[in-house]
Amino acid sequence: SKYESEGVARSEELQEVHQAFADAGRKPI
């Protein structure tokens, strides 16, 4: 359904953000 695909897209987006923070935490700035 429309809402399901929207939720999947949002979930993937959150995973990317989480990964970005994880990478930032591992590397000294």
From Swiss-Prot:
Alphabetically ordered keywords of this record: Actin-binding, ATP-binding, Calmodulin-binding, Cytoplasm, Motor protein, Muscle protein, Myosin, Nucleotide-binding, Thick filament
Molecular function as annotated in GO: actin binding; ATP binding; calmodulin binding
Residue ranges, annotated region (Disordered): 1-29
GO annotation, cellular component aspect: myofibril; myosin complex; myosin filament
Localization of this protein: Cytoplasm, Myofibril
Segments of skewed composition (Basic and acidic residues): 1-16
Domain comment (free text): Limited proteolysis of myosin heavy chain produces 1 light meromyosin (LMM) and 1 heavy meromyosin (HMM). HMM can be further cleaved into 2 globular subfragments (S1) and 1 rod-shaped subfragment (S2).
Subunit (UniProt): Muscle myosin is a hexameric protein that consists of 2 heavy chain subunits (MHC), 2 alkali light chain subunits (MLC) and 2 regulatory light chain subunits (MLC-2).
Summary of the function given for this chain in its UniProt record: Muscle contraction.
Name of the molecule in the record: Myosin heavy chain, muscle
